[in-house]
C-alpha cells in the first residue's frame, strides 16, 4: 500500500500522527510519503497545489488528510486552491459520510437513539462547480448567480454506488432532494434512482424532501440506512448527521473516486482549530476513524473492522476523562 499524507494546518499534524500510529499497528509496512501542503507552504513559496504534486499524488493508493485552513491565509485560497482542486483533479465524485452513534457517546437527542446510516453525497457537480457570475457588483442593482450543474453521468455513478452500499447494509436507500421546487435537477435524480433501482429489487427505496429529511434526522434517525443526495444538500445534512452523533469531532469522511483510477482521500471532518494547535489536546479519534474508512476502501476489511472495534471500545470507556492527543492514539492502537 502506498499512502500519501497531507498533515496540513493547525491540529492536522497532531491528529494525523496518531492516525498513522494506528495504521502502522494494524497494517505494518505501509509505504508513506508526506506532502507539505497548506498555510506554511503558501507563505513560504506562494504555492497552494503545484501540478507536480498532483502528478505525484496520482501514484498513490490513497491519501490521508489532516486539516486545512489558517487565519493568516485569505479565505478561500486554501479551500478552493487545495481542497476543491484535489476533489476535481482526482475526480472525487463521492463524498462518503458515515453517521453512527457509538456507545458511550452522548447525543443531543433524548434517549440516545440507535443511529447508524451513511450519506453518499455527490462531490463534483451541483452549485460547487464555479458556474456562475456577478454583474454590477457593489451597486443596488447587483446580480449574482450560482448555477447548479447535474449531469446524467454524474448522478448515475453516485446513485449506483449508493445502491451497492445499501445492498451490503440494511437494504434501504433514501433519495433526499427538493423535487417540488428544483424540478429539472430533481427530475433527473428521481428518474435515475428509479432506473438504477430496477437492478436492485432487494433494496427498498424512499424519497424525502431535504427539509423533511432534516426533521426526521432529529425525530427518527433510525429510519435511515443509506442516503443519496446532491452536493449542496449533502453538504448540509452531513453536518447535521455529525451533530446528532456527537459532533464533528467524531466524524470521518471519504472523498472517493469509485472507478479507482485516482487515489481517494480520507480525512476527519473537523477543521484545523488553530486556537489549540500545538497543545497536545486535540482529539484524534475522527482522524483514526478515517483510517478505518481508508482501509475498507482498499479492501482491507478485517483491518478496518479492527480499527472500528478499537475506536468503539475507546469511546465506550473513556467517560469524561480528557486525554492527551498521543494518549488517545496509544490507547486505540493498544486495543487492536
Curated annotation (Swiss-Prot):
Catalytic activity, as annotated: (2R,3S)-3-isopropylmalate + NAD(+) = 4-methyl-2-oxopentanoate + CO2 + NADH
Free-text comment on the cofactor: Binds 1 Mg(2+) or Mn(2+) ion per subunit.
Keyword presence, Metal-binding: yes
Subcellular location: Cytoplasm
Database matches in Pfam families: Iso_dh (PF00180)
GO terms under biological process: L-leucine biosynthetic process
Residues that bind NAD(+): 271-283
Tree of life domain: Bacteria
Site positions for Important for catalysis: 128, 178
Keywords, in A-Z order: Amino-acid biosynthesis, Branched-chain amino acid biosynthesis, Cytoplasm, Leucine biosynthesis, Magnesium, Manganese, Metal-binding, NAD, Oxidoreductase
Pathway where this protein functions: Amino-acid biosynthesis; L-leucine biosynthesis; L-leucine from 3-methyl-2-oxobutanoate: step 3/4
Family affiliation: Belongs to the isocitrate and isopropylmalate dehydrogenases family. LeuB type 2 subfamily.
Subunit structure: Homodimer.
Protein name: 3-isopropylmalate dehydrogenase
Taxonomic lineage: Bacteria, Bacillati, Actinomycetota, Actinomycetes, Mycobacteriales
Amino acid at each position: 500500500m502506498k499512502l500519501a499524507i497531507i498533515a496540513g494546518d493547525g491540529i492536522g499534524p497532531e491528529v494525523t500522527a496518531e492516525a498513522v500510529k494506528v495504521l502502522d499497528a494494524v497494517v505494518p509496512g505501509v509505504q508513506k510519503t508526506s506532502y507539505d501542503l497548506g498555510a506554511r507552504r503558501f507563505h513560504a513559496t506562494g504555492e497552494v497545489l503545484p501540478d507536480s504534486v498532483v502528478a505525484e499524488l496520482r501514484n498513490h493508493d490513497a491519501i490521508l488528510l489532516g486539516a486545512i485552513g489558517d487565519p493568516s491565509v485569505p479565505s478561500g485560497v486554501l479551500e478552493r486552491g487545495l481542497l476543491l482542486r484535489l476533489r476535481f483533479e482526482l475526480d472525487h465524485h463521492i463524498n462518503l459520510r458515515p453517521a453512527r452513534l457509538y456507545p458511550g457517546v452522548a447525543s443531543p437527542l433524548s434517549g440516545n437513539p440507535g443511529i447508524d446510516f451513511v450519506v453518499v453525497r455527490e462531490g463534483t457537480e451541483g452549485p460547487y462547480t464555479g458556474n456562475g457570475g456577478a454583474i454590477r457588483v457593489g451597486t443596488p442593482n447587483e446580480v449574482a448567480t450560482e448555477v447548479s450543474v447535474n449531469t446524467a453521468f454524474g448522478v448515475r455513478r453516485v446513485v449506483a454506488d449508493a445502491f451497492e452500499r445499501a445492498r451490503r447494509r440494511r437494504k434501504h436507500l433514501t433519495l433526499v432532494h427538493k423535487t417540488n421546487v428544483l424540478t429539472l435537477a430533481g427530475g433527473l435524480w428521481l428518474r435515475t434512482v428509479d432506473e438504477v433501482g430496477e437492478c436492485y429489487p432487494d433494496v427498498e427505496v424512499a424519497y424525502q424532501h431535504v427539509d423533511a429529511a432534516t426533521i426526521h434526522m432529529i425525530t427518527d434517525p433510525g429510519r435511515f440506512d443509506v442516503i443519496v443526495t446532491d452536493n449542496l444538500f449533502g453538504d448540509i445534512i452531513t453536518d447535521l448527521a455529525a451533530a446528532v452523533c456527537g459532533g464533528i469531532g467524531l466524524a470521518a469522511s471519504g472523498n472517493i473516486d469509485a472507478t479507482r483510477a485516482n487515489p481517494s482521500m480520507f480525512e476527519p471532518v473537523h477543521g484545523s482549530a488553530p486556537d489549540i494547535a500545538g497543545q497536545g489536546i486535540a482529539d484524534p479519534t475522527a482522524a483514526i476513524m478515517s483510517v478505518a474508512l481508508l482501509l475498507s476502501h482498499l479492501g482491507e476489511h478485517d483491518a478496518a473492522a479492527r480499527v472500528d472495534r478499537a475506536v468503539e471500545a475507546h469511546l465506550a470507556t473513556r467517560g469524561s476523562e480528557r486525554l492527551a492527543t498521543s494518549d488517545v492514539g496509544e490507547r486505540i492502537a493498544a486495543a487492536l
